[in-house]
């Protein structure tokens, strides 16, 4: 049986700062970009990543999953933490200590199970303070990886000064203007600021409720934006 460290070294490839992310792009950039293009093909691509070189500009941290020697899943993050995030001054300040934001998640065709491995670990590890904005199918995928919905008031503080429009009555979904189009999103993650119990998990009924809302709002967005 393989040791855990051996398994991790064989399957996980990480970049923990701009310099190491840049090295990952030098080595795996074509695969990373192809996977991101595939993952975001239904929504016109990933915002801000139009070529592989853009990955370095968007990501402060990257995690790749390698299966049988090939990169099959990509997760990119922006570091939104304050340099002194652990101090009492900033620990509970959502406007300064904003955790680690997911900026892109994708898997190559038929390999979503490996992206799920990355996200399940991230949403389980509370100290990572991982969160992201999701809509439509991506919202359901994140929920099934253990992400917890974040109330609008907390999401708005974290996203400040970006403006929220049409805050939905459910208390979680909101609409933002992105490149001239209205997009309804839900923020989800595991951040302690969100006042979730560490052991809290959504029921299947909860997941289905949020899934139905995500699909409903995505359909409304398509009509509104004439897609």
Regions found by a protein language model. Name each.
Residues 59-60, 125-128:
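Short, high-confidence coil segments that cap the C-terminus of an alpha-helix
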Residues 52-53, 116, 120, 139:
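Short amphipathic alpha-helical segments and helix-helix/interface helices
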Residues 43-67, 71-100:
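A conserved beta-strand-loop-helix scaffold within acyl/acetyltransferase catalytic domains
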Residues 4-18, 78, 82, 129-227:
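Terminal substrate-recognition subdomain of acyl/acetyltransferases
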Residues 107-124:
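Conserved acetyl-CoA-binding loop-helix of GNAT-fold acetyltransferases
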Residues 31-50, 217:
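Helix-loop element at the rim of GNAT/NAT acetyltransferase active sites that forms part
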């Amino acid at each position: 049986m393989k040791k855990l460290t051996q398994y991790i070294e064989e399957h996980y490839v990480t970049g923990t700062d701009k310099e190491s992310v840049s090295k990952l792009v030098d080595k795996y950039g074509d695969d990373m970009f192809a996977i991101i293009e595939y993952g975001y093909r239904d929504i016109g691509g990933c915002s801000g990543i139009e070529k592989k070189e853009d990955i370095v500009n968007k990501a402060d941290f990257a995690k790749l999953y390698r299966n049988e020697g090939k990169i099959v899943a990509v997760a990119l993050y922006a570091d939104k933490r304050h340099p002194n995030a652990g101090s009492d001054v900033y620990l509970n300040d959502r406007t300064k200590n904003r955790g680690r934001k997911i900026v892109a998640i994708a898997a190559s065709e038929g390999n979503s199970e490996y992206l799920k491995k990355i996200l399940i670990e991230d949403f389980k590890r509370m100290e990572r303070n991982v969160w992201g904005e999701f809509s439509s199918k991506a919202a359901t995928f994140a929920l099934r990886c253990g992400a917890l919905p974040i109330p609008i008031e907390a999401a708005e503080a974290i996203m400040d000064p970006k403006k929220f429009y049409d805050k939905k009555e459910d208390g979680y979904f909101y609409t933002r203007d992105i490149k001239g189009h209205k997009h309804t999103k839900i923020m989800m993650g595991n951040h302690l600021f969100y006042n979730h119990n560490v052991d809290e998990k959504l029921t299947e009924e909860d997941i289905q409720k949020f899934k139905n809302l995500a699909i409903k709002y995505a359909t409304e967005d398509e009509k509104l934006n004439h897609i």
